[in-house]
Swiss-Prot record:
Gene: Apoa4
Tissue expression profile of the protein: Secreted in plasma.
KW Ribosomal protein (keyword) present: no
Originating organism: Mus musculus (Mouse)
Gene3D superfamilies: Apolipoprotein
Function per UniProt: May have a role in chylomicrons and VLDL secretion and catabolism. Required for efficient activation of lipoprotein lipase by ApoC-II; potent activator of LCAT. Apoa-IV is a major component of HDL and chylomicrons.
Protein name: Apolipoprotein A-IV
Protein family per UniProt: Belongs to the apolipoprotein A1/A4/E family.
Record-level GO BP terms: cholesterol efflux; cholesterol homeostasis; cholesterol metabolic process; high-density lipoprotein particle remodeling; hydrogen peroxide catabolic process; innate immune response in mucosa; leukocyte cell-cell adhesion; lipid catabolic process
Amino acid sequence: MFLKAAVLTLALVAITGTRAEVTSDQVANVVWDYFTQLSNNAKEAVEQFQKTDVTQQLSTLFQDKLGDASTYADGVHNKLVPFVVQLSGHLAQETERVKEEIKKELEDLRDRMMPHANKVTQTFGENMQKLQEHLKPYAVDLQDQINTQTQEMKLQLTPYIQRMQTTIKENVDNLHTSMMPLATNLKDKFNRNMEELKGHLTPRANELKATIDQNLEDLRRSLAPLTVGVQEKLNHQMEGLAFQMKKNAEELQTKVSAKIDQLQKNLAPLVEDVQSKVKGNTEGLQKSLEDLNRQLEQQVEEFRRTVEPMGEMFNKALVQQLEQFRQQLGPNSGEVESHLSFLEKSLREKVNSFMSTLEKKGSPDQPQALPLPEQAQEQAQEQAQEQVQPKPLES
């Protein structure tokens, strides 16, 4: 299912070679964004796509998303263009086919569960309550750690900055000798505090995923007696739900890590500036310390205010996804786009599998040749025989 999409993924992975700085998630994100934009209005997009400079589009796309890590090997664009043009012609048809398959699967589940509507509602309600109870400690812990670590950072750095300001006044005639050790120690303290912040605040994504798995397994067992004859379809739908919920866990970790990196990026130049000003005059150093002290308070408070709600927002998002799943199984589900989660799940699995193959076979200095569409399936089969067997894309 959606083989052409998978092949494009493999090709784009091959473009980057096996450079260590390019991860499978980065590649999958770029490819998935590309597919999503194209499939929003597939027919119109395909027609427009074939009229424009495909090479420039993809080059710009990868440059924006991956930066220097996406530098292409010479001549790769010429191989990519015919591949993508052929792919685009099949995209709309493939997407619609998968959409219909998932729609039929949901209809079969609704028909089977309809006589037990009250029990289904009760089961979901109980499961949502348990999910909230299981997730609450993570949100509380994240909030506590944010408050503790940001407060500790200020307690470590603010008094030290004030000590440096006092030392300046007492050592005007011997500024460099007296202040250089303090400035170096300030930088060490700052770096150490940032590392501790990362260590304590990075959410435990694997633990969150395990909680999600356990919660959904409990739900599956509770619904099993109500889905006799269609349990495989229920299992399949819940795989898609699990993928989306776990994706939220990964995104939470990414967001928190990004905020920590941004805080460090904002404050590090100010710390460096203090060191550089030690070689200058008293007035310049004093101003640099004042700027750092002021920005430390502002930036840390902004960080705390932004990150603190993320745990609770994550919990609400998971409960909402569970509620949306319940509605999909109900009589008034309306139009849904649940097929997209299956396409994305399969796409990412394919990227991960192929990246693993490249790491085992390829060299960072020797990018893999780009397969054309008609060659892709044969090449994938050859690779599978060499230890890695990618899973077939699911429908």
